[in-house]
């Protein structure tokens, strides 16, 4: 079930590795989309706005969890590329202990602070109860988010991007069925949407864990390999925490933006919710290319093949540009149809118009978005997650400036510019950072090679 990414044509390898990731990300988006569509169509605009008002806070916490799990997997990919199986198993074991500890702490803290957080976000009075209920139950499912994402990250680190897709297809179907039953049949509203998401995530996590234990023989551990090791946890944390914090820092800018947008009223929140869900769906392919590059870069660094890393990044550029152009064209002709999934386009004319404008401005900048994703994940895969985290700071600063300066002056148009400006700001940091990282590692590998030759001559 493992796959070596250190040989073969980079374009073909990355593309084939990306496709299952893309489908998996699409199905993962269906968790959120199913909630949003069914809530918007069967409960109402206020319920849709309530779910949407939690988006940035949701990403703030769950983005940290997912980023940390992906960070824990980077050393695992590097060790797999270096064929150090025993140390690989020790890293998997200690990643498990870290996930358990973080899962307990984050669940307790976030559930306890749900209502104060939504009040701090100046959530409109007519939707704050629904928003607090929804996000509180989502936070209660954090342990299942850890479980599924850590197992999936391990599989990807070992070169298997297909198996997580199969589990997501199943659980997405379960999520949609539960949404329909709990929201429509039992009239549970936003609570039903949150419970459906939690149950679906739990099913995905448990089934994928069972599969990992049974099928990946390379992970069968001795009692000694299961032991907690401080040095191993330090290495895992040195990768995982910056990647988690990168998502969190980026999300802080989103939270500030959400705070500013909430002040524009429920209709604006609903419009951005519908447009934002569509954008997330369309950007899945770009995120998948980036995720593939993290594993690809990690394995090839372990094999001391930085030439393949450069080739892989160039191949990823081609994929990003091709997809971005196609996505822009598809959105140009199908935006009303997509928005119609969330809202009644005949009665909510003003909200539909705002959502269309928002999607237009965002889709114009998909190419820089794709480029920053490729550079960021490549840097992370090469082990420089703190450097990649700094790009999140650039995004946060850009969104903060827009929230505090442009939105008060330009109103909704200022909100439309938030993502494009943040993406460009991150690109201005990440491209030089990528060039420096690869050159720095090439010099280190060359120095190590020369030292070995000198030692051999001396002997």
Locate each region found by the language model:
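N-terminal transmembrane alpha-helices
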Residues: 5-43, 56-71, 75, 100-107, ...
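Transmembrane alpha-helix boundary and packing residues in multipass membrane permease domains
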Residues: 21, 25, 37, 74, ...
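Small-residue-rich hydrophobic transmembrane alpha-helices
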Residues: 48-108, 145-164, 271-335, 369-391
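Transmembrane helical elements of multi-pass membrane transporters/channels
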Residues: 16-35, 137, 148, 171, ...
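Short runs within selected transmembrane alpha-helices of multi-pass transporters and secretion channels
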Residues: 69, 138-156, 164-172, 193-206, ...
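Hydrophobic transmembrane alpha-helices of multi-pass small-molecule transporters
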Residues: 60-63, 175-180, 205-209, 281-284, ...
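Helix-terminus/linker motif at the lipid-water interface of multi-pass membrane proteins
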Residues: 30-49, 118-125, 181-188, 248-281, ...
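Short alpha-helical transmembrane segments in multi-pass integral membrane proteins
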Residues: 1-18, 76-141, 185-241, 297-364, ...
């Amino acid at each position: 079930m493992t796959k070596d990414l250190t040989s073969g044509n980079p374009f073909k390898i990355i593309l084939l590795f990306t496709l299952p990731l893309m489908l998996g990300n699409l199905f993962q988006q269906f968790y959120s989309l199913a909630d949003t569509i069914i809530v918007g169509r069967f409960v109402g605009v206020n319920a849709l706005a309530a779910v949407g008002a939690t988006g940035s806070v949701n990403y703030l916490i769950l983005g940290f969890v997912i980023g940390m799990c992906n960070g824990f997997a980077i050393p695992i990919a590097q060790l797999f590329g270096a064929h150090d199986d025993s140390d690989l198993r020790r890293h998997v074991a200690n990643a498990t202990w870290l996930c358990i500890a973080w899962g307990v702490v984050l669940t307790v803290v976030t559930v306890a602070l749900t209502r104060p957080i939504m009040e701090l976000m100046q959530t409109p009075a007519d939707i704050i109860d629904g928003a607090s209920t929804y996000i509180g139950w989502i936070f209660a499912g954090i342990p299942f988010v850890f479980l599924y994402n850590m197992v999936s990250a391990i599989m990807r680190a070992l070169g298997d991007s297909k198996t997580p897709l199969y589990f997501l297809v199943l659980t997405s179907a379960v999520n949609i069925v539960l949404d329909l039953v709990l929201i429509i049949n039992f009239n549970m509203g936003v609570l039903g949407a949150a419970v459906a998401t939690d149950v679906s995530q739990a099913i995905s996590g448990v089934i994928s864990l069972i599969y990992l234990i049974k099928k990946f023989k390379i992970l069968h551990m001795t009692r000694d390999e299961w032991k907690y090791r401080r040095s191993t946890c330090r290495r895992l944390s040195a990768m995982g925490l910056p990647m988690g914090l990168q998502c969190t820092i980026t999300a802080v800018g989103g939270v500030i933006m959400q705070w500013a947008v909430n002040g524009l009223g429920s209709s604006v929140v609903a419009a951005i919710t519908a447009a934002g869900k569509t954008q997330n769906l369309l950007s899945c392919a770009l995120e998948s290319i980036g995720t593939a590059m993290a594993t690809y870069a990690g394995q090839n660094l372990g094999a001391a093949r930085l030439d393949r890393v450069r080739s892989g990044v160039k191949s990823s550029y081609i994929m990003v540009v091709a997809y971005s152009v196609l996505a822009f064209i598809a959105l140009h002709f199908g935006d009303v149809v997509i928005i119609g999934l969330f809202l009644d386009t005949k009665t909510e004319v003003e909200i539909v118009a705002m959502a269309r404008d928002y999607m237009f401005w965002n889709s114009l900048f998909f190419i820089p978005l794709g480029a920053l994703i490729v550079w960021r994940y490549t840097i992370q895969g090469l082990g420089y997650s703190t450097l990649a985290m700094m790009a999140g700071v650039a995004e946060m600063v850009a969104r903060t400036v827009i929230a505090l300066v442009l939105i008060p002056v330009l109103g909704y148009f200022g909100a439309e510019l938030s993502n494009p400006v943040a993406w460009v700001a991150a690109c201005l940091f990440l491209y030089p950072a990528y060039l420096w990282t690869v050159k720095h590692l090439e010099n280190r590998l060359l120095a190590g090679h020369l030292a070995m030759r000198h030692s051999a001559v001396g002997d």
